[in-house]
Amino acid sequence: MKIEERDGLARIAKFETPHGPIETPTVLPVINPNIMNITPQEMKPLGLQGIITNSYIILRTPELRERALREGLHSLIGYDGPIMTDSGTFQSYVYGSIEFNNREVVDFQRRIGSDISTILDVFTTPGTPKPEAEKAVIETYNRMLEVNDEEGIIAGPVQGGVYPDLRQKSAELMNSTNAGYHPIGGVVPLLETYDYSTLVDIIINSKINLSFNKPVHLFGGGHPMFFAFSVYLGVDLFDSASYIKYAKDDRLIYPDGTRDLARITELPQWSPLYDRYTVKEIRDLDKERRSLEIARHNLKAIFMEISEIKERIYEEGLAQYVAQKARSHPSLMKAYSRIMSYSNILEKYEDLSKKTAYFFYDSFSTRNPYVSRINRFTESYLSSNKKDTYAFTYRAWNPGYTNSEFVRDVYQKIDCNALISWSGTFVPAELENTYPIEQTVSSGFEPDPDFSRAKDLIAPFRVDMYKGEKFEGEQVRSFNLNKIRMVADYQFGSGVGRMIFRDDVRINVSKTGRIRGILSKEGRQIATMRNDGFFTLTYYGASLIHSQLKPPAMRVTVSKESAEYNAKGYSVFFKFILGSDENIIAKNDVLVVDEDDVLAAVGKAMVSGRELREYTEGIAVKVHEGRDQSEK
């Protein structure tokens, strides 16, 4: 996978197949080789990049089998792009068994020229008992081992029923094989019953235990209603037969659900049928023609949702889109609640900050991954600082607004830990300008009017609520100095603030009071402060951290060959990375070092610490200053 854009676990990426690249996220429409209602060529203008067809149907149909072996799969289907083949697993689930074994099915897919072949895995249903589901996981793994030496891209499905630990086990087993593509199987019954919350457990326990360098496919997840949620959790591809199945039942797909033809009065303007038919005219078509036209509408709805999701990823606003869609159906809201229960996991893959503002809707917003990140830091901060602590509500201190008088008359006259209320929690006051604290757009809904929930966070610590007291005397501390140290601790790790910002640093402040840059006493630039409230380090600033933080903290280790180029200011490519700090946050500054821990450059990591070690193509760190540039 070559990553192009990312938004947490969601990504726009490309992977190569023998018949060209596929850019994800996308949908592979299911093509029935016996009945080609709409050809792949007709689908191309909608955004088609590949299709999926069933090798079992071809194998068991003599005419199709002979033609596929003679002319090849692509000639049979009439499509020159990437084709994935399924193995017949779902048919074995529906009909009880099929007449071919795993090796025969995979070998046939290879012989007819499938771009992505799938093993004959063992399907498990939501009702499958756990011991039986575990046997299916082991058998599916063994079947992958049977064909582990096959050439080409082999899809190794993740099974495990509704049991998160079995999904984890299956993912880890498949990840240890040569499978180059990972479908998540056995989920169609859950999709059909709108059991999206269970599906959340399945997806996330599969995704985080698979390599980030391989595509993840949600088998049978062909309705756009759940696309955004799935992509948010790291799914790259879907397949869809729903466009034609629903059409045969006179059901029209919309991004937010499905509607019966008998119950609609108007067609949406985006529908390809809008300027060609009235609803009555569609109803009056003969059955075959009507199904075909509705299928075209359904395909448009499916690809339109994929386009919207990709745009949200570019904007770094997919989380907002998911939050909005969650409120369109109770089953989606239940799924969203389940997603938020995984915030501590999701937070590891979220960027340091985003292009878009943080939208605060209601109490669900207090469970956002960014809130989890800040809460964890706040708890650590209070645990390590044994001073008295004051908590200031938004009535006294409002993030994003000038609080100069309050800073002068209160903060700088008492030596204490200062917390401010924000989005249903308490955060250190010094982080007031960092993302997402300042960059919040609030609904005005106060989920915790008496701050009882926020107080739970600080309950283990001795905290006094500020009641409007006035403090006399001289200034005992500098807010700006404490601010830059606190931001550095939050951004780079506890204790870093004092490492790089001594008492005698010079802090440049704009006319509006915002910090712009920090210099050493001698006038050397240490860092600049960005619009999101975080720092961009200079090479000199990075060297101060490097000299005091032990490896692997903040490090991306590269080969000596790469380090020479990085020292000149060139970016780091994934293929040259030898190791990285597991705790690196995407879009945060990192130290680029060689095998001997010699600092070569400082730059912005494009992905998280784990991802830095797993991707093999593209830019991993955008260097903004190398050693050679600094020395000039």
Swiss-Prot record:
Pathway: tRNA modification; archaeosine-tRNA biosynthesis. It is an enzyme of class 2 (transferase). Its cofactor is Zn(2+). Substrate binds at residues 121, 186. InterPro entries: ArchSynthase1/Queuine_TRR (IPR050076), PUA (IPR002478), PUA-like_sf (IPR015947), PUA_sf (IPR036974), TGT-like_sf (IPR036511), TGT_C2 (IPR029402), TGT_C2_sf (IPR038250), TgtA (IPR004804). Gene3D superfamilies: ArcTGT, C2 domain, PUA domain, Queuine tRNA-ribosyltransferase-like. GO terms for biological process: tRNA wobble guanine modification. The keyword Zinc applies. Its EC number is 2.4.2.48. One of its GO terms (molecular function) is RNA binding. Transmembrane segments: none annotated. It catalyses: guanosine(15) in tRNA + 7-cyano-7-deazaguanine = 7-cyano-7-carbaguanosine(15) in tRNA + guanine. Pfam families: PUA, TGT, TGT_C2. One of its GO terms (cellular component) is cytoplasm. Binds 1 zinc ion per subunit. CDD domains: PUA_archaeosine_TGT. The keyword Metal-binding applies. The active site is at residue 86. Residues 553-628 form the PUA domain. Keywords: Glycosyltransferase, Metal-binding, Transferase, tRNA processing, Zinc. HAMAP family: TgtA_arch. Exchanges the guanine residue with 7-cyano-7-deazaguanine (preQ0) at position 15 in the dihydrouridine loop (D-loop) of archaeal tRNAs. PANTHER family: QUEUINE TRNA-RIBOSYLTRANSFERASE. Belongs to the archaeosine tRNA-ribosyltransferase family. This is tRNA-guanine(15) transglycosylase.
